UniProtKB/Swiss-Prot annotation:
Pathway listed: Bacterial outer membrane biogenesis; LPS lipid A biosynthesis
Source organism of this protein record: Colwellia psychrerythraea (strain 34H / ATCC BAA-681)
E.C. number: 2.3.1.191
Function: Catalyzes the N-acylation of UDP-3-O-acylglucosamine using 3-hydroxyacyl-ACP as the acyl donor. Is involved in the biosynthesis of lipid A, a phosphorylated glycolipid that anchors the lipopolysaccharide to the outer membrane of the cell.
An MF annotation (GO) of this entry: N-acyltransferase activity
Quaternary structure and interacting proteins, as annotated: Homotrimer.
Taxonomic lineage from the root: Bacteria, Pseudomonadati, Pseudomonadota, Gammaproteobacteria, Alteromonadales
EC class (word): transferase
Repeat found in the keyword field: yes
One BP term from GO: lipid A biosynthetic process
Protein's name in the database: UDP-3-O-acylglucosamine N-acyltransferase
Active-site positions on this chain: 248 (proton acceptor)
Length: 349
């Protein structure tokens, strides 16, 4: 798929500004077939500037055009697509030029589908996928090769599942969702009762399910456990990165974003519009307010009742400095006692 610069300007609602040294009519007809970074872009490609630290690359880029904000136009040596939010412009153009192949096309003869499965119009199912009894697939659902869809699961309109995904029994997935390869939704939560007086555990059947809302995206190899009694819920507009673990009965509020390798323990409720960076650990049975941000590798151990940015942990330093700091931390208890003794002496004087 290719577009002229003039067509792209219309689709992005951007203003096309051509340098005086170039022919405006010819530039408007330039064919664009791809996107690239400022450093790597060439003829027929558009770059974008959304971070000022890359602005020096505007003078040397070989892109046919660059998406820029109004304050960067003068520094641009090639045609500029000017808009207030260049990063959104990049996202919109990427959608226009996206050449990702379809997950599957039609129903593969090697797919194993139970007789009573309800299949909507224009549904695709890849090779070696197994779909059990009672499943409902809405219109335009696409399921890749090697997937398993368990008994009674429901998948909403225009949802896409890539290869080797496991959807357990009774899981419900909304419409226009995108789930990447090797994700598992609806496996048993980590529920066990200790046997009194013995080092043994009695497994607790997980009787709830998982409910995924609409317009949810889930990355590769993420795992979402089914609820013990109530359901685990991932609400509308949530985006989840790769390799996230969400335990049983967790609720993730609308439009929350969670980055890779984050772990959320059971029965925690996360509010709307939160941003959780990578490798964050969230304790179980706590509640997090709307509009909270947690920086990478934070440990969330208690309720968060107010919106804001939260951090924990220590950024990396040279090993020598870390060893000194660690040694000082170990002496804090004795140091505190000495300070208290000195305060008592000063108080007497």
């Amino acid at each position: 798929m290719t577009y002229t610069l003039a067509e792209i300007a219309i689709k992005l609602d951007a203003k096309l500004i051509v340098p005086a040294a170039l022919d405006e009519q010819n530039e408007a007809l330039t064919q664009i077939s791809g996107l690239a970074t400022l450093a790597k872009a060439g003829t027929g490609q558009v770059a974008f500037l959304a971070n000022s630290k890359y602005q020096q690359q505007l003078s040397s880029t070989n892109a046919s055009a660059v998406i820029v904000s109004p304050d960067a136009v003068e520094a641009c040596q090639v045609s500029a697509l000017v808009m207030d939010n260049p990063y959104m412009g990049y996202a919109m153009l990427a959608s226009l030029l996206d050449s990702t192949p379809k997950v599957s096309c039609g129903i593969h003869p090697n797919a194993v589908i139970a007789d009573d499965v309800l299949i909507g119009e224009n549904v695709s199912v890849g090779a070696n996928t197994v779909i059990e009894s009672g499943v409902q697939l809405a219109d335009n659902v696409s399921i890749g090769a090697g997937c398993f869809i368990g008994h009674g699961a429901k998948i909403g309109e225009s949802t896409i599942l890539w290869a080797n995904i496991t959807i357990y029994h009774r899981v419900e997935i909304g419409h226009h969702c995108l789930i990447q390869a090797s994700t598992v939704i609806g496996s048993d939560g980590f529920g066990y009762a200790p046997v009194k007086g013995q080092y043994k555990w009695h497994k607790i059947p997980q009787l709830g399910s998982v409910i995924i809302g609409d317009h949810v995206e889930i990355g590769a190899s993420t795992t979402i456990d089914r609820g013990a009694l109530d359901n685990t819920e991932i609400r509308d507009g949530v985006i989840l990165d790769n390799q996230i673990q969400i335990a049983h009965n967790v609720i993730v509020g609308e439009n929350t974003a969670i980055a890779g390798c984050t772990v959320i323990a059971g029965s925690t409720v996360i509010g709307k519009n939160c941003t959780i960076a990578g490798l964050v650990g969230v304790n179980g049975h706590i509640t997090i307010a709307d509009n909270c941000v947690f920086t990478g590798m934070s440990m969330v151990t208690k309720n968060i009742s107010q919106a804001g940015v939260y951090s924990s942990g220590m950024p990396v330093v040279q090993n020598k400095e870390w060893n000194k700091t660690n040694a000082r931390v170990k002496r804090l208890d004795s140091l505190t006692k000495r300070v208290k003794e000195l305060e008592k002496l000063l108080a007497k004087n």
